[in-house]
């Protein structure tokens, strides 16, 4: 069992009290959080905190992910690294710098990503429409991945797969939800808003998982390392988005847990309301807790642990050359 | 595993246990704590309780290994135990 995340929606003050976390909300409520039983803290409201609170979080290795206006991801406060290994970072950068090695890792990541997209379509094929031809195309694209010789070529294959995948969304989703076209900054309609929000949550889950290893989150393999971005998190998130985000979008919409009332349209964009975000997060947390039997570990693991094992596998691959098992849906 | 801890100790000594329990568990009611802990956390907690113990103190720790064999109902102003949202 992994520890649970905690989300704070209230506005108020976060402080340290008697060796644990204390929240005083503006409504005058006081609550204590068990700092030793929290995996990661998500701040969604207006919250002030001081260095003593950060020091406590640091001591217990709890990362804080901060969301600003309308729950746009603003950044993370990450505890001091518990895992330090120059060796790992050197190997990671070497692998990145070696075209051959980088490409091989990139292949695994994109193959897994396409595989997971295909698994989603396969599930809904026959239920919500006929996607057999797209499933077949994705199967071909997955095989085409290992033939690519350059990273931009690889990204082109991935983009192609993703486009075909998103094209099926309109048939899977119950009316009035429509994707039409994947757009963000700002999301143009309800479905886009929902996908963007959940992708952000998957991304932060990957940031937390990578932080538990000595890997450098800024050096990714498929995404080009740049400034101010955790490109390795983006790589890992690509594998898990179909499993954790997209599948949840379909479920929330088709079971009518989310309706158009949970969104507000402002200026050019469309975003989730606070109540909507709460509903989505409750379900997201539930899916992180869901377990599946792991063939190599021979025990049940939660989806949250699955992200962790994926990252461990990558690290093992970088250090020892053991094959990297990017998570491909097997259940 | 799911854990419930209740204590009945002299008023002056409550803060000792409150402090060590709050770090790991949700403070549900005055002397009732609930949460999900790992086996290691439970052992550490029990050891810590034991080191603070005096003859006047009474503490009971309940543990449930199977989350499916565990249910709860709340009445009145109670907070939902195990909620991940504030």
Curated annotation (Swiss-Prot), chain A:
Keyword DNA-binding in the entry? The reply is yes
How does inactivating the gene affect the organism? Answer: Loss of the 8 Cas genes in this locus (cas1, cas2, cas3, cas4, cas5, cas6, cas7 and cas8b) leads to loss of CRISPR interference against plasmid targeted by this CRISPR locus, i.e. plasmid is not destroyed by CRISPR.
Q: Which InterPro entries match?
A: CRISPR-assoc_Cas1 (IPR002729), CRISPR-assoc_Cas1_C (IPR042206), CRISPR-assoc_Cas1_HMARI/TNEAP (IPR019858), CRISPR-assoc_Cas1_N (IPR042211)
Pfam families named among the record's database cross-references? Cas_Cas1
| GO-annotated biological processes | defense response to virus; maintenance of CRISPR repeat elements
Lineage, top-rank taxon, reads Archaea
- Does the record's keyword annotation contain ATP-binding? no
The record's keywords, sorted A to Z, are: Antiviral defense, DNA-binding, Endonuclease, Hydrolase, Magnesium, Manganese, Metal-binding, Nuclease, Plasmid
**What is the uppermost EC class here?**
hydrolase
Task: Give the enzyme's EC designation.
Answer: 3.1.-.-
Please tell me where Mn(2+) binds in this chain: 158, 223, 238
Q: Which cofactor does it need?
A: Mg(2+); Mn(2+)
GO terms (molecular function) for this protein are: DNA binding; DNA endonuclease activity; metal ion binding
**Subunit organization:** Homodimer, forms a heterotetramer with a Cas2 homodimer.
Q: Which HAMAP family match?
A: Cas1
Q: Which NCBIfam families match?
A: cas1 (TIGR00287), cas1_HMARI (TIGR03641)
Recorded family membership: Belongs to the CRISPR-associated endonuclease Cas1 family.
**Extra info from the record?**
There are 3 CRISPR RNA loci in this organism and a single cas gene locus. A CRISPR-Cas type I-B system.
Function, as annotated: CRISPR (clustered regularly interspaced short palindromic repeat), is an adaptive immune system that provides protection against mobile genetic elements (viruses, transposable elements and conjugative plasmids). CRISPR clusters contain spacers, sequences complementary to antecedent mobile elements, and target invading nucleic acids. CRISPR clusters are transcribed and processed into CRISPR RNA (crRNA). Acts as a dsDNA endonuclease. Involved in the integration of spacer DNA into the CRISPR cassette. Plasmid targeted by CRISPR locus P1 transform wild-type cells very poorly.
Q: What is this protein called?
A: CRISPR-associated endonuclease Cas1
Task: Output the lineage of the source organism.
Answer: Archaea, Methanobacteriati, Methanobacteriota, Stenosarchaea group, Halobacteria
From Swiss-Prot, chain B:
| Traits of the deletion mutant | Loss of the 8 Cas genes in this locus (cas1, cas2, cas3, cas4, cas5, cas6, cas7 and cas8b) leads to loss of CRISPR interference against plasmid targeted by this CRISPR locus, i.e. plasmid is not destroyed by CRISPR.
Q: Which UniProt keywords apply?
A: Antiviral defense, Endonuclease, Hydrolase, Magnesium, Metal-binding, Nuclease, Plasmid
State the Pfam families in the record. CRISPR_Cas2
Instruction: Write down the EC number.
Output: 3.1.-.-
By its UniProt entry, which CDD domains does this protein fall under? Cas2_I_II_III
> Which Gene Ontology molecular-function terms are recorded?
metal ion binding; RNA endonuclease activity
Q: Which NCBIfam families match?
A: cas2
- What family does the entry list? Belongs to the CRISPR-associated endoribonuclease Cas2 protein family.
Cross-referenced PANTHER family, in alphabetical order? Answer: CRISPR-ASSOCIATED ENDORIBONUCLEASE CAS2, CRISPR-ASSOCIATED ENDORIBONUCLEASE CAS2 3
Q: What does this protein do?
A: CRISPR (clustered regularly interspaced short palindromic repeat), is an adaptive immune system that provides protection against mobile genetic elements (viruses, transposable elements and conjugative plasmids). CRISPR clusters contain sequences complementary to antecedent mobile elements and target invading nucleic acids. CRISPR clusters are transcribed and processed into CRISPR RNA (crRNA). Functions as a ssRNA-specific endoribonuclease. Involved in the integration of spacer DNA into the CRISPR cassette. Plasmid targeted by CRISPR locus P1 transform wild-type cells very poorly.
Protein name per UniProt: CRISPR-associated endoribonuclease Cas2
| Native source organism of the sequence | Haloferax volcanii (strain ATCC 29605 / DSM 3757 / JCM 8879 / NBRC 14742 / NCIMB 2012 / VKM B-1768 / DS2)
